[in-house]
UniProtKB/Swiss-Prot annotation:
Residue numbers binding Mg(2+): D81, D123, K124, E491
The protein, known as: Dihydroxy-acid dehydratase
GO molecular function, a single term: 2 iron, 2 sulfur cluster binding
Modification N6-carboxylysine, positions: K124
Length: 618
């Protein structure tokens, strides 16, 4: 029978000093036999997805204590990728994921906590906490702050739904008046919550449902709705139950590594492909698998992407639907239900609130389940009032969207495409693979051949795009922006948004060893591995080279001979210490970022630390 971890610091004569300190935090005699549960919050006033989380920790804590546990809250950092975008701040975004994972490990292990409730929301916070959960392998439940309501603006008498990306695109479109741009800017992000499309934050929060580590609705109930409060309350009660099952009943099936098995990773990736999730999810799933000790690789992602159809299209792929519309259509359980009917989901994987995923789908899929309470839950609607206050409204849609032929969520027979929303491409320019969000690519350019326009920084590429130096048929190559080369693997949202605003969204491609925002659409291919700074062939591309892209056949090819490529590689290696570095880029790299770059792996490994370097130093 496992012993409560917290007994290390709460029991025995030698722990009198530790108990004195625990007492100073408010613990009483009767608390020292109870599980100590870490409430891992991420409140910050810098990020709209987190501004409303200040009171959420105590909301969960009260439920934990009412159920017989002791709750202790701490906060992690949280970076807003949208605010950090387009300047040196973006260098810090991806490294913050690993810093969050480390900080959770430090706090939980230093204080011997028995379990965790992770209150996450935005881009790097959910994956950072997921990595920590797998690393620590103690009972955990995730509950997110929830998605933002979609913005609404009236242009030329027509009400248009919009989001952050619309503001970025219109800002670079000089045909848009300043007055119209001001309206869009003020309306795009109306409430607290994670940005309203299927961007990285919402994608990751949806995936926690498929992993079995969060409750139904975690990814889709808007932050402003009163129903989300119940998710926090249930999480507080359920984590105490999981603690008792593990520590008092020796039930190891409730541990994260028992839940997030290879089959669970396959389920999560299947959902990701079906819902057209952000390409960043690939990075984070691979990183989480490494922490979980699960052999899940780009090859698995490639296999899944070939067999799973795209069942859901949400902004930025379309302006018709946002996350609030996915919820109305049955949420993630609705998508999983369609995947289940298509035989594409493993029903037997356990989760934190039901016997297994199959039981959860049977209970929560609105197509097969006619329970009034379930249907009412998925009718939770946006309030339509700008606010930073959580649970501030209880509006409901009049009816659900259960049209699986023409609705937001489709069945397999009526899929948006029988090809999934993500694809892995391989070729001589990316031997270890690269990623494209096919759900955001017009099918007319799934096969594309163009001339390389080579840039060694995102800034240089943006300058060329806005300077009208990029023309139809170009392939914009942005290199030395990978995990090592950036460092930090910047998101390329501005270049893709500006290509779209210049009318080149369907006329050009973009290839990078960096990554893309979940808000990116168009023929945007990222995560080229190995990256340029790690000796990848993307570092050998020359201006004017022909690049061939073939999504249906999962191929990307630099059209030069093997001999020519070998000569270029030899010439690069001959540069010695100057090899595999950007030639003309001025960028100040702090010691903190240098430390990250020193051990970062390429994107095909999740951009995690190369632990072999640590092992070699033992």
């Amino acid at each position: 029978m496992p012993q409560y971890r917290s007994h290390t610091s709460t029991h025995g004569r030698n722990m009198a000093g530790a108990r004195s300190l625990w007492r100073a935090t408010g613990m009483k005699d009767g608390d020292f036999g109870k599980p100590i549960i870490a409430v891992v919050n991420s409140f910050t006033q810098f990020v709209p997805g987190h501004v409303h989380l200040k009171d959420m920790g105590q909301l969960v804590a009260r439920e934990i204590e009412a159920a017989g546990g002791v709750a202790k809250e701490f906060n992690t950092i949280a970076i807003d990728d949208g605010i950090a975008m387009g300047h040196s701040g973006m260098l810090y975004s991806l490294p913050s994921r690993d810093l969050i994972a480390d900080s959770v490990e430090y706090m939980v292990n230093a204080h011997c906590a028995d379990a965790m409730v992770c209150i996450s929301n935005c881009d790097k916070i959910t994956p950072g906490m997921l990595m920590a959960a797998m690393r620590l392998n103690i009972p955990v439940i995730f509950v997110s702050g929830g998605p933002m309501e979609a913005g609404k603006v009236k242009i030329q008498g027509q009400v248009i739904h919009l989001d952050l990306i619309d503001a970025m695109v219109k800002a670079a479109d000089h045909s848009v008046s300043q007055a119209e741009l001001d309206d869009v800017e003020r309306s795009a992000c109306p409430t607290c919550g994670s940005c309203s499309g299927m961007f990285t934050a919402n994608s990751m929060n949806c995936l926690t449902e498929a992993f079995g580590l969060s409750l139904p609705g975690n990814g889709t109930v808007v932050a402003t709705h009163a129903d989300r409060k119940q998710l926090f309350l249930r999480a507080g009660r359920q984590i105490v139950e999981l603690c008792k099952r593990y520590y008092e009943q020796d039930d190891a099936s409730v541990l994260p590594r028992a839940i997030a098995t290879k089959a669970a990773f396959e389920n999560a990736m299947t959902l990701d492909v079906a819902m057209g999730g952000s390409t960043n999810t690939v990075l984070h799933i691979l990183a989480t698998a490494q922490e979980a000790g699960v052999d899940f690789t780009m090859a698995d992602i490639d296999r899944i992407s070939r067999s799973v159809p795209c069942l859901c299209k949400v902004a930025p792929m379309t302006d018709k639907y946002h996350i609030e519309d996915v919820h109305r259509a049955g949420g993630i359980m609705g998508i999983l239900g369609e995947l289940d009917r298509a035989g594409l989901i493993n029903r037997d994987v356990p989760n934190v609130y039901a016997k297994n995923l199959g039981e959860a789908i049977d209970r929560w899929d609105v197509v097969r389940q006619h329970d009034v309470k379930v249907h009412e839950f998925f009718k939770a609607a946006p309030g339509g009032v700008p606010t930073q206050v959580a649970f501030s409204q209880d509006r409901r849609f009049n009816e659900l969207d259960i049209d699986r032929t023409h609705g937001c969520i489709r069945n397999k027979a009526n899929a948006y495409s029988q090809e999934g929303g993500l694809a892995v491409l391989y070729g001589n320019i990316a031997l270890d693979g690269c990623i494209v969000k096919t759900a955001g690519v017009d099918e007319s350019i799934w096969k594309f051949t163009g001339k390389a326009r080579v840039f060694e920084s995102q800034d240089a590429a943006v300058e060329a795009i806005l300077g009208e130096k990029i023309v139809a048929g170009d392939v914009v190559v942005i290199r030395y922006e990978g995990p090592k080369g950036g460092p930090g693997m910047q998101e390329m949202l501005y270049p893709t948004s500006y290509l779209k605003s210049m009318g080149l969204g369907k006329e050009c491609a973009l290839l990078t060893d960096g990554r893309f925002s979940g808000g990116t659409s168009g023929l945007s291919i990222g995560h080229a591995s190995p990256e340029a700074a790690d000796g990848g062939a993307i570092g050998l591309v020359e201006e004017g080279d022909t690049i061939e892209i073939d999504i249906p056949n999962r191929r990307i090819h630099l059209a030069v001979t093997d001999g020519e490529l070998a000569q270029r590689r030899a010439a690069m290696e001959a540069k010695g210490e100057a090899a595999w570095q950007p030639v003309s880029r001025e960028r100040v790299i702090s010691p903190a970022l240098q430390a990250y770059a020193l051990m970062a792996t390429s994107a095909d490994k999740g951009a995690v630390r190369d632990v072999k370097q640590i092992q070699r130093r033992k």
